[in-house]
Amino acid sequence: MNVFCLGLSHHTAAVSLRECFAVGGDESATVTNDLRAAAGLTEVVLLSTCNRVEIYGAAVDPSAAMEFASSFLQCRAGRTADFARYEGAAAVQHLFRVASGLDSMVLGETEILGQVKDAYAAAFGAGHTGPALNRLFQHAFRAAKQVRTESEIGRGAVSVGSAAARLAASALGDLAACRALLLGAGEAGEDVARSLHSRGLMELLVANRTSTRAEALAAGLGGRAVEFAHWRDHLATADIVIACADAPSRLLRAAELAPFLAVREGRPLFLLDLAVPRDFDPAIRALSGATLHDIDALEAVAREGESLRAAEVAKAEAIIAGQVAEFVRRGADRPTLAVAA
């Protein structure tokens, strides 16, 4: 079996390191092409999300390929990292667990399956997959579906948005007296907005580069859309600022925030940065009057209640074990009709 996985996740690296290795959607094709050539991979799929950056590949010599891939990624990032490495059946098990939400920060969440499917579809469309990875990923999707239908791993799970709202409430108390400014109106932003609204938020302001998305999200929750170019104008009056805008560079630096804090008359400002790479300057933590958290702060909140789902986790893990055994038994090198999920 010549498949492998190499990468970083929230289990092994803080966001300060993960963001250095993150690959944005606009650069994914170029990075994948360069990686495949540099590491001598016969097949490759690149998965980059807020909580993980992973390379799934097939090569004649997986160990050597992982060394080349590791060197390529570290050279590109300008940072060193201790990558997790999986080969053969271990790589199969890891992908099946990832696709099923068993390896997620929010245990049992379903967004990761869509992200894995998107990563595979992009690689498939670019001709980067072949018999080994086509079969591996198609089986992973079946395993994830079985976990979803035969276990209740997702029941009672908190979403990223609900964890964010819970963290804000723990810092500020009753959100009915709070005004929130949300940067980004994508799936994550919508999840956050709905979770804040469900906790009785006094007012929601939404800023997004595409104004129509901000307007639609705000209108659906009784909020107000603000121009993305002028969102900083609301820093003096907002109580909560949450970023998930996937910006190409920092949206807010400490020096930019300081003047707004000076006119807040001691009112605390809660900032939460859910983006990877991060949208807010980490130096903001040193400013008096502001509290800044990043996505890693959600892990403790997301883990609450997991003990109540222990039986479902065990059931899901048993399903994965059975699917891995079936995959190995049938042989990883047998060609499969290539059909994108």
Q: Residues of each region from the PLM?
A:
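A glycine-rich (often HGG/GG-containing) alpha/beta subdomain
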Residues: 1-107
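N-terminal loops that bind phosphate or other acidic moieties
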Residues: 10-12, 16-29, 188-194, 198-200, ...
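Internal alpha-helical scaffold of NAD(P)-dependent oxidoreductase catalytic cores
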Residues: 63, 67-80, 124-128, 134-143, ...
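Glycine/serine-rich phosphate-binding loop and adjoining beta1-alpha1 elements at the start
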Residues: 78-176
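Rossmann-like NAD(P)-binding element
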Residues: 223-257, 262-272, 276-277
